[in-house]
Regions:
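Acidic catalytic loop of the alpha/beta-hydrolase fold
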Residues: 170-176, 202
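Short beta-strand/loop motif that positions the catalytic acidic residue
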Residues: 165-168
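Primarily recognizes the serine-hydrolase "nucleophile elbow" in alpha/beta-hydrolase
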Residues: 67, 109-111, 117-162
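C-terminal catalytic histidine-bearing segment of alpha/beta-hydrolase fold enzymes
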Residues: 179-182, 186-238
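Short beta-strand element of the alpha/beta-hydrolase
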Residues: 50-61
Length: 238
């Protein structure tokens, strides 16, 4: 998937506007393409005077609010913005997903005060493929959280500049494919982590998704993208 039209990836200053804090807003239309909508969550402490990590969420059935809810508590705890597409699909043509990304990406940069080096992407199933593709093709994504995903051609994965947290149910039909990504990242000496959970092909439980965010926080410390928090590191290693 290579149909990204927004390749000028410099972060723009946030446009002044009313954002609802501490609650999931189910539908926000993009100013770039009003046919594209997404759900969002910003922490209670959000202020445009500082920059915040942002997580792009891609559900394979366009369930933006539902998918955002899975990350809401972790986003509040760690101070992340969540933006979750209402348009991404799986098992279909590329064009709807390309339109969703091309409408979301610049709009999110305009509306929210985001940290340009702390942009993350996650997805489930086909949404995980989309998240990985976005990271591969833009070099603008710091980390990918892949849930029950696969890769179209694992052998072609190369020069991975982002951190990867993979997870899948132990009876998920994409379980082995997710582990193949893990094996390839090991070969490339990339930064990775994999955790399974009991279950079939579905989004991971909230507590596991929270750990994925926590792990990304630790990786950000290693990369000098945020101050070191020794207490957080200790909790993450427990």
């Amino acid at each position: 998937m290579r149909a990204w039209a927004f390749l000028v990836l410099l972060a723009a200053p946030a446009v002044a506007g009313t954002l609802h804090k501490g609650e999931i807003v189910e539908r926000l239309a993009s100013n770039v393409d009003p046919s594209v909508t997404y759900a969002y969550y910003v922490p209670e402490a959000y202020t445009p005077e500082r920059q915040w990590p942002v997580l792009f969420v891609f559900d394979p059935r366009s369930r933006g609010a539902m998918a955002a809810e899975l990350f809401r508590e972790a986003a509040e705890e760690f101070g992340w913005i969540v933006v979750s597409s209402n348009d991404t699909r799986s098992d279909g043509p590329v064009e709807p997903n390309a339109r969703a990304i091309n409408g979301m990406w610049p709009d999110v940069h305009d509306r929210f005060a985001i940290a340009p080096k702390r942009i993350y992407a996650t997805g489930f199933s086909g949404g995980a493929i989309l998240a990985f593709s976005l990271a591969e093709t833009t070099n603008a994504v710091a980390g990918v959280i892949s849930v029950g995903g696969r890769h179209d051609d694992v052998a072609r994965i190369d020069n991975v500049s982002f951190d990867w947290f993979g997870t899948a149910g132990n009876t998920d039909f994409n379980y082995l494919e997710t582990r193949e990504i893990e094996d390839r990242l090991k070969e490339l000496d990339a930064q990775w982590r994999f955790e399974s959970f009991p279950g079939r092909h579905r989004w991971a439980p909230k507590d596991l998704l929270r750990r994925s965010i926590e792990w990304m926080e630790v990786q950000a410390m290693k990369r000098g993208l945020r101050p070191v928090d020794k207490a957080l590191v200790r909790r993450a290693l427990e």
